[in-house]
């Protein structure tokens, strides 16, 4: 329109991009002066594959007993290297957060003080940090506390809290709607998590986040806190793995018409070995008739030693054409036991 635009000096900090100036002009001249013509042609709107996957994630968590929370992305300045905003209204909201777990821990702590016996929460939000430039990263964060199976029931004076494997299973169930594989890699590099009960979450070979129990020092600092598990997953990596074009191609298998045969095996392993590696070895050895293998029990005791732990696996055998007998699986089952003993320097427990 041939206008001359002058920016008032005390407003110039709000005007950085071209679109900021366009919005300012629109506000000043009045939105009623814009044409009401709709774009032509009008196309029907639809959700993208990423948006659909994100909805599945939220539904998966709520269906598994989690509550979605929204925490404030503006935080007060502290000793950490936070990104300051140029025009804060309050000192308490003068910086952009670089994590979400602290607020989630406060939410859990408030619930514990209020007498709640469990608290399962999740949030999809942004964090901000600076490398050579300002980075905005979208994360799926959450916290797990307490065992909803028991509620307020007193279990003969025993601790009703979830153990590490049960809590990790809760996260696995919530994300099962995406039908992706998430591997766990033990780590002790996250300072606010327990060094022996923390794992990096690996998706398609990428470091996507973490899952772990809070560090004992946090429980000591906040007297009311108890055993809490925190998790964080990069949303871009999560959605990227779940929206591959070949991910949702249906594959149909014939329903089995013959029964399966199950056998349990129990070994004492050094803690340095990963369960995923053990299961992979079992699958590889028994691939002809072995249909499935999964962990059913974990046992820790001082008699085993501090560096050792007992795992029990359930193996399912099935032949698609006939009912199996003991003699059909004896050789394969024995071979699996021998291979596990040799590969992981262990012995079968009676």
Language model: regions and residue ranges:
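Long hydrophobic segments that form regular secondary structure
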Residues: 1-5, 112-115, 121, 127-132, ...
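A carboxyl-terminal module marker
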Residues: 154-350
């Amino acid at each position: 329109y041939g206008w001359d635009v002058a920016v008032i000096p005390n407003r110039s900090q709000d005007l950085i991009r071209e679109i900021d100036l366009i919005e300012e002009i629109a506000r000043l001249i009045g939105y009623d002066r814009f044409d009401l013509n709709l774009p032509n042609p009008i196309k029907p709107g639809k959700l993208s594959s990423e948006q659909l996957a994100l909805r599945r994630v939220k539904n998966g968590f709520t269906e598994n007993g989690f509550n979605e929370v929204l925490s404030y992305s503006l935080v007060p300045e502290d000793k950490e290297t936070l990104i300051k905003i140029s025009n804060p209204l309050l000192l308490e909201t003068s910086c952009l957060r670089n994590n979400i777990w602290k607020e989630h821990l406060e939410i859990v702590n408030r619930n514990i003080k209020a007498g709640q016996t469990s608290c399962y929460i999740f949030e999809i939000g942004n964090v901000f940090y600076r490398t050579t430039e300002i980075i905005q990263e979208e994360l799926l964060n959450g916290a797990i506390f307490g065992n909803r199976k028991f509620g307020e029931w007193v279990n003969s004076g025993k601790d009703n809290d979830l153990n590490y494997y049960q809590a990790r299973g809760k996260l696995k169930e919530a994300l099962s709607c995406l039908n992706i594989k998430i591997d766990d890699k033990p780590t002790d590099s996250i300072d606010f998590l327990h060094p022996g009960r923390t794992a990096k979450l690996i998706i398609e070979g990428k470091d996507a986040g973490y899952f772990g129990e809070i560090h004992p020092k946090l429980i000591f600092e906040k007297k009311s806190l108890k055993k809490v598990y925190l998790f964080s997953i990069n949303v871009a990596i999560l959605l990227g793995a779940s929206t591959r074009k070949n991910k949702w191609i249906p594959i149909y298998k014939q329903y089995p018409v013959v029964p399966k045969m199950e056998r349990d095996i129990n070994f004492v392993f050094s803690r340095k070995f990963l369960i995923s590696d053990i299961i992979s070895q079992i699958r590889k050895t028994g691939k002809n008739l072995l249909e499935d293998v999964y962990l059913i029990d974990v046992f820790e005791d001082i008699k085993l030693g501090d560096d050792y732990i007992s795992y029990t696996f359930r193996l399912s055998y099935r032949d698609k054409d006939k009912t199996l007998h003991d003699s059909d699986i004896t050789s394969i089952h024995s071979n699996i036991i021998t291979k596990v003993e040799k590969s992981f320097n262990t012995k079968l427990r009676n």
